[in-house]
Design a protein with these regions (language model features):
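Conserved, structured core segments of small domains
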Residues: 1-105
Length: 105
């Protein structure tokens, strides 16, 4: 399992479309080239603290089954980081999301 922090409104819009295409705050899969993810809950909390502290809209944590994605997932170390993060190189099918949990930071 891997995790992705999402605006609840972005996830709600993805459900009827059948797939989620938001990479990170304000950027789409097409703009970024991949969807940012976290390898575990601790990593997701770190991402929230660094990047989502100013966000006032409701957030959800998506739990994603990599085997259901149908696209590559690569562990990569972003520039300026000291740990690897899973990057999802395609849209996330709604069926690949096994849990959606409200997230507060």
């Amino acid at each position: 399992m891997i995790f992705h922090l999402a605006l609840a409104a972005d996830w709600d819009a993805a459900v009827p479309a059948g797939e989620y295409r938001v990479s990170t705050l304000g950027r789409t899969l097409e703009e970024e080239g991949f969807i940012h993810a976290s390898a575990d809950l601790g990593q997701a909390r770190g991402v929230a603290g660094r990047n989502y502290g100013h966000v006032t809209e409701p957030l959800v944590l998506l739990e994603i089954d990599e085997d259901r994605l149908g696209c590559p997932v690569r562990l990569e170390v972003p520039e300026g980081a000291d740990e690897a993060f899973p990057h999802i190189y395609g849209p996330i099918p709604v069926a690949a999301v096994t849990a959606v949990t409200p997230f507060s930071h």
